[in-house]
């Protein structure tokens, strides 16, 4: 099965705004031209098929595909369908249980643990957020820790699910170490993402999805390929010294960079505290690496954390709806510098989603080939 490089026979560079591929750090025309447009229904079907062929049961394959397509639709390409090949590798290798028997245990009115049984993290995280939302509608606020899990993709997928259920939702996960501490000379924290979603009447949800590192690792890999220098203060060499040479990068710097990285390091620590320490899961620096390893057999025993808050149990839904509508209207109307525009968290992603509904989802050719969809 083949597809044209872009709508109406035009090239990708002629039809795709460069920011649509922003998460991969893609900024040059040659790199943008190295993608193909794929219709979402076909991309979904092929991704599901790849996971099933690797042995994943329906719940595992469905949740992973749902989370990957969330990322691909919203322009978070590093966590989109490009991860399908990695997930099939760990399913076949034995690191991930293809047929997990997840179990949850409610320990209080607003607290629970969910055992992912070493399955892919997507199904566990969706289940944890669903459980947290249900408990929050009773208790007002509820947290669910996930244990014995694996990589769950884009944290925003689960915050969005909670927001679409009408609650304020927070999701996070610690990951294997790739980020130095502020002033540190070795990897200690993962990129440790934090996502927050909130419902907005008659609008898309307010949606924050961010890593606690200065830049994503994919940005380093891209700049290495392009031979471009990195911005100052975002990465370090093997001795922990800041470097702008992507070939010398051994670790990332925390959010805030050389001068203010203590803020990002503390945020990463908060994610570790809630995802790993609170749940008894593996600490970042003790975790088997997602990649950069030959071990695709040993479970990584990752932890996640999901929190849900029901606005009905605080000031009430009517006041919440009025306040968040006014807040966002005033935010978007706030004065901007010349040539700039003001956006709320999620605005850029919703614009990407709308564009990709029109053009199809751009996928790198290697991933398209893996899914049997390359031109």
How should these model regions be labeled?
Residues 20-21, 25, 29-54, 307:
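Generic N-terminal amphipathic, Lys/Arg-enriched alpha-helix
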Residues 33-43, 282-375:
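Catalytic-core signal marking the mid-to-C-terminal active-site face
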Residues 36-40, 56-82, 96-107, 297-301:
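N-terminal glycine-rich anion-binding loops that anchor highly charged ligand groups
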Residues 80-133:
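Active-site cofactor/substrate anionic-group-binding motifs, chiefly glycine-
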Residues 111-201:
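A generic, well-ordered mixed alpha/beta core segment in the N-terminal half of proteins
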Residues 179-247:
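Phosphate/diphosphate-binding glycine-rich loops and adjacent basic-rich segments that engage nucleotide
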Residues 216-280, 297:
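Small-residue-enriched flexible segments
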């Amino acid at each position: 099965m083949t597809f044209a490089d872009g709508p109406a026979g035009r090239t990708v560079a002629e039809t795709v705004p460069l920011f649509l591929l922003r998460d991969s750090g893609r900024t040059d025309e040659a790199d943008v031209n190295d993608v193909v447009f794929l219709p979402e229904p076909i991309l979904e079907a092929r991704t599901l098929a790849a996971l099933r062929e690797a042995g994943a049961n329906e719940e595992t394959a469905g949740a992973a595909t749902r989370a990957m397509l969330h990322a691909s639709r919203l322009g978070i390409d590093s966590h989109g369908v490009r991860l399908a090949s990695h997930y099939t590798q760990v399913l076949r290798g034995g690191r991930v249980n293809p047929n997990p028997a997840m179990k949850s245990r409610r320990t209080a009115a607003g607290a629970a643990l969910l055992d992912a049984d070493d399955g892919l993290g997507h199904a566990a995280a969706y289940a944890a957020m669903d459980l947290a939302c249900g408990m929050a509608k009773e208790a007002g606020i509820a947290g669910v820790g996930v244990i014995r899990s694996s990589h769950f993709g884009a944290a925003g997928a689960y915050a969005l699910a909670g927001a679409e259920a009408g609650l304020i939702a927070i999701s996070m996960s610690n990951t294997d170490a790739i980020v130095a501490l502020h002033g540190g000379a070795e990897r200690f924290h993962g990129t440790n993402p934090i996502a927050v979603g909130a419902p907005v009447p008659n609008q898309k949800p307010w949606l924050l999805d961010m890593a606690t590192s200065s830049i994503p690792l994919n940005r380093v890999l891209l700049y290495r390929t392009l031979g471009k220098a990195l911005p100052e203060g975002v990465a370090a060499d093997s001795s922990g010294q800041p470097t702008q040479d992507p070939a010398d990068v051994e670790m990332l710097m925390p959010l805030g960079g050389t001068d203010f990285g203590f803020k990002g390091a503390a945020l990463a620590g908060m994610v570790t505290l809630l995802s790993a320490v609170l749940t008894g899961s593996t600490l970042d620096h003790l975790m088997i690496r997602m990649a950069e390893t030959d071990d695709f057999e040993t479970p990584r025993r990752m932890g996640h954390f999901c929190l849900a808050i029901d606005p009905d149990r605080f000031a009430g839904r009517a006041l919440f709806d009025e306040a968040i509508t006014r807040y966002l209207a005033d935010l978007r109307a706030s004065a901007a510098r010349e040539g700039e525009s003001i956006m709320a968290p999620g605005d850029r992603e919703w614009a990407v989603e709308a564009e990709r509904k029109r053009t199809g989802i751009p996928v790198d050719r290697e991933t398209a080939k893996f899914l049997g969809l390359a031109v």
